[in-house]
Amino acid sequence: GFTHYVHGFEGELTLWVQQSFRNEILSDVLSFHYLFVYLFLIWFSPIYYILCRDEVMADKAVLNYSIIYLLAVPLYLFFNVEVTSSFIPGMDAIMYHESWNLFFFTEVDPLDNGIPSLHVGLPLGLLIINRLHIRSLGIKMAEWRHREFDLFVAANIPIYLFSIQYLGIHWISDVI
């Protein structure tokens, strides 16, 4: 794979993040957020727009997912990069502990799909689509009927950015 190139470029900054903020409660909260809030966000986004009877935004949300996955799959297949916790010595796979609520997810992960991070790409794509949509309508975000949902998506992106470093999952270059 290409993990040694990424590690050579980034060094052990993600290890520093993990060691600097290590906390059991934070680990549990971020593990839950990384898996379940993310799943809620990606499943709920198109459904939210459908329930609001905004078919245009529902279509755009699904198109966002399709494009992001079309871009990501070749990287997963041909540019294998291990997750940070399986490559950096001393880095713990915090999320991959034995817990009843994480067992299914942690047992099926091959730990070799470190680039790109869909946890950042999908919600960031939604934000971009939202901004482009309100621009095309000629309105401000404060006037848009989905502004609260947009704020929810925007608030989760920094949490994902920190979580993927802290939990020992992704490299910094995954999100650039």
Where on the chain are the PLM-derived regions?
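Membrane-embedded catalytic cores of phosphoryl/pyrophosphoryl-handling enzymes
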Residues: S99-I176
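Interfacial segments of alpha-helical transmembrane regions
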Residues: Y38, I42-F78, F149-V153
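C-terminal TM-helix exit segments that contain a strictly Trp-centered aromatic cap at the helix terminus
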Residues: V37, A72-S85, S163-Y166
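Membrane-water interface of alpha-helical transmembrane segments
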Residues: F21, D28-S31, V56-D59, L63, ...
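Transmembrane helix-loop junctions in multipass membrane proteins, especially transporters and channels
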Residues: I50, D54, N80-I88, I169
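Hydrophobic alpha-helical transmembrane segments
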Residues: F32-I47, H119-G125
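N-terminal transmembrane-helix/juxtamembrane module of multi-pass inner/ER membrane proteins
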Residues: G1-L41
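Membrane-interface interhelical connector segments
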Residues: E82-V108
